[in-house]
Amino acid sequence: MHMPSKTNNIFLLSVLLTPQAEKKRQLNVSTHPHIYIVFRQQELTVFMMIMISLLLLASLLPHLTFTARVNVGIVNGTEAKPHSRPYMVSLQKYKKHICGGFLISDEFVLTAAHCWKGYPEILTVVVGAHDFRKSEDSYRVEVKSYISHPHYTFCSLQNDIMLLRLHEKVKLNNNVTWISLPKECEDVKMNTLCSVAGWGRLWMKGPSTDRLMEANTTTIKNKVCKCKWGSDFQASQMICAHGDGGSCIGDSGGPLVCGNTAVGVTSFVDIKGCNSPERPNVYTKISAYLPWIHQIIRNIK
């Protein structure tokens, strides 16, 4: 996760350092906020021990239920129907998810520029995935070329877009295919219901998910976004959206999808929290970069 030096209000949504496998959280009775027990073990009868065990179990049930309920979405999201978004890919470092991305052809992935820190960092792309715990429907592809927008810099919020050329063309099937891009200079209308998806965290400091999650979000007026973000928002290059659900850390690079078209690339959110009510999430506007995208693909082919 990177916090640009130019502002104190922004989080880019990539996982910049390779995350270790998240350890299962263990409940320590003595430090649990709702439980405090002091006793001398030799004074406990079997009956008392049983009663205490039952009381502990009863006190934990609400927390266990809550965990099971919230551990199913990015931010207020729901689990996507398996392979209903066959364009989605996972960008990984040392086989750990750090960012999202999406296929725009059988050879190219579009993602956020801040997801890659430059050589010698090596990323791989996992296609056809839904649940990372089940690998039978997915496979890993090496990246041949990293092509960040020429005007993107690490500390900049602008031009946060990158093409990845895959080392080999993906095999297209029901679980793997690309998504359409908008036409040049085609802007999505405000108040359009769109969606985001990813394998990112469930909240700012929460755990990530093994399953692809999705959430609805609605585009908002540029004037409103400019008022919220100030000079950090550039209407010619960015789109703002907000809703009950939204992107979080690890969702960077995934698409903002309106209809069946990818119109934006997940870029940054308010530092106060993922899907903050104070500031809408910001996406790189794909239509503004179509000439660059098409030129790169033409030159390579």
Q: Could you say what each language-model-derived stretch is?
A:
Residues 4-6, 18-24, 28-31, 187, ...:
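C-terminal helix/juxtamembrane-tail motif
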Residues 68-73, 91, 109-112, 116-154, ...:
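Conserved H-D interstitial segment of serine endopeptidase catalytic domains
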Residues 77-81, 152-154, 205-207, 280:
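Conserved, non-catalytic sequence blocks in retroelement Pol enzymes and Pol-derived host proteins
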Residues 84-86, 120, 159-161, 174, ...:
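Extracytoplasmic
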Residues 147-153, 169-212:
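Active-site substrate-binding loop(s) of clan PA
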Residues 162-168:
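Conserved beta strand-loop-helix elements of the APE1-like EEP
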